[in-house]
Amino acid sequence: MDKKMIFKELTELHDEYCKDCFIKKQFRKEFGKTYAHSFCINKCTVGEKLKQYGDVLTNH
């Protein structure tokens, strides 16, 4: 998969699932920005997928 396709996929995933995510908004409100961000990266399935794409770009 080339970089252009990965960026397209990242954008689509973010716009579809993360942009208006209720859980992220709620965690940010209750626990703060850092906790919400950490949750998204480590526990959310979409966040894990985004992280995988990021790893591919880093090692590309």
UniProtKB/Swiss-Prot annotation:
Pfam families in alphabetical order: zf-C2HCIx2C
Entry superkingdom: Bacteria
Stored InterPro entries: DUF2602
Protein name per the record: Uncharacterized protein YpeQ
